[in-house]
Amino acid sequence: MPKMKTKSSAKKRFKLTGTGKVKGNVAFKRHCLSAKSQKMKRQARGTFMLFKTDSDNVKKYFLPNGG
């Protein structure tokens, strides 16, 4: 059976850290920013770590070869 391909959409959205955790971007920061509070915009900067259950699914189904 051939290797599973990495999903192209997941390659663009997630990165694997050295310890095997999955890092992603925070949502809700592209447009309509005037309606959002300063706190929400500030907290949406940078990246966040996925929870273990979510990261297990991402690694199994979307990044089988490590991204």
UniProtKB/Swiss-Prot annotation:
Q: Which InterPro entries match?
A: Ribosomal_bL35, Ribosomal_bL35-like, Ribosomal_bL35_CS, Ribosomal_bL35_sf
List the keywords (alphabetical): Ribonucleoprotein, Ribosomal protein
Region forming the signal peptide: none
Instruction: List GO terms (cellular component aspect).
Output: cytosolic large ribosomal subunit
One of its Pfam families is: Ribosomal_L35p
Q: Which Gene3D superfamilies match?
A: 4.10.410.60
Provide the GO biological process annotations: translation
**Molecular function via GO:** structural constituent of ribosome
Q: Which family does it belong to?
A: Belongs to the bacterial ribosomal protein bL35 family.
Name of the protein in its database record = Large ribosomal subunit protein bL35
**Organism placement in taxonomy:** Bacteria, Pseudomonadati, Pseudomonadota, Alphaproteobacteria, Rhodospirillales
